[in-house]
Swiss-Prot record:
EC primary class: oxidoreductase
Name of this protein: Oxygen-dependent coproporphyrinogen-III oxidase
Keywords: Cytoplasm, Heme biosynthesis, Metal-binding, Oxidoreductase, Porphyrin biosynthesis
Active site as annotated: H108
GO molecular function: coproporphyrinogen oxidase activity; metal ion binding; protein homodimerization activity
The encoding gene: hemF
Main localization, broad class: cytoplasm
Length: 302
């Protein structure tokens, strides 16, 4: 079947949210997700889940949303002007994980489906998503594992898929005002529809299911490492870059706010604690300097 099946996508996304939350609870070993179901006045709603003050995760949020409306927001029509005048539905699962231990990276993943329709015209639809990793202290084996998992899940869909979406991720998660990468990248894709609904949906499923395979082994490797005030201060400083990107550059944040989405859920990606420091410079040859020099730069990890 190559006509879009919104109900099938929704079933997958709800199950994916359940699976990821269960695996994160197992990895944390103490805290549980609290669920908050909500309705959007303009149409649709969602299921927000947040885990706080766990043994491993300071905060983890895993959101499902399914929103619809009669008119496209400016953030979408600017990107695709042919969508003006169409009604829309947008479904997705989005997650951000902020560990307490600075040696465990922050991670983000998102998978989504979008369809816009108007009478007398074919629907315009696509899939998007990806996952990316933001370490504070870099470990080459973690970066290689992260990218190897991404490569492996892409390979059944074509040898060109990983390099294309790896580059797109590097380009997207770039803080232009700092001329810095947000992290070590991963995968980012959008506007995916060229191979038909079934094939595009299969790829989105592979990315959604691949996230835990990419992230949780890193959590297990790093969660027992001891850390102190120095590492925590640097983690909180680097979290500031996460905030800057999400509020200034992220298309998903802008889309959510412009469509009247639920602000608490949209800003769930924000770290619970963060700090800024004027003109911070890491000490030369320190682990902090190595992050800038060796990790948050565009490079081939495989």
């Amino acid at each position: 079947m190559n006509t879009p099946d919104i109900a099938q996508v929704k079933r997958f996304l709800l199950n994916l949210q359940d699976e990821i939350c269960q695996k994160l609870e197992q990895a944390d070993g103490a805290a549980r997700f609290a669920e908050d179901s909500w309705q959007r006045p303009g149409g649709g709603g969602g299921r927000s889940r947040v885990l706080r003050q766990g043994r491993v995760f300071e905060q983890a949020g895993v959101n499902f949303s399914h929103v619809h409306g009669d008119e496209m927001p400016a953030s979408a029509t600017a990107h695709r002007p042919e969508l003006a005048g169409r009604s829309f539905e947008a479904l997705g699962v989005s997650l951000v994980i902020h560990p307490e231990n600075p040696y465990i990276p922050t991670s983000h993943a998102n998978v989504r489906f979008f369809i816009a329709e108007k009478p007398g015209a074919d629907p315009v639809w696509w899939f998007g998503g990806g996952f990316d990793l933001t370490p504070f202290y870099g470990f080459t084996e973690d970066a290689v594992h992260w990218h190897q998992t991404a490569f492996d899940l892409c390979l059944p869909f074509g040898a060109e898929v990983y390099p294309r979406y790896k580059k797109w991720c590097d380009d997207y998660f770039h803080l232009k005002h700092r001329n810095e990468q947000r992290g070590i990248g991963g995968l980012f894709f959008d506007d995916l529809n060229a191979h038909g609904f079934d094939q595009s949906f299969r790829f989105m499923q592979a990315v959604g299911r691949g996230f835990c395979d990419a992230y949780l082994p890193i959590v297990e490797r790093r969660k027992a490492l001891t850390w102190g005030e120095r590492e925590r201060d640097f983690q909180l400083y680097r979290r500031g870059r996460y905030v800057e990107f999400n509020l200034v550059w992220d298309r998903g944040t802008l889309f959510g706010l412009q469509t009247g989405g639920r602000t608490e859920s949209i800003l769930m990606s924000m770290p619970p604690l963060v700090r800024w420091e004027y003109d911070y410079q890491p000490r030369e040859d320190s682990p902090e300097a190595a992050l800038y020099r060796d990790f948050i730069v565009v490079k081939e990890w495989l």
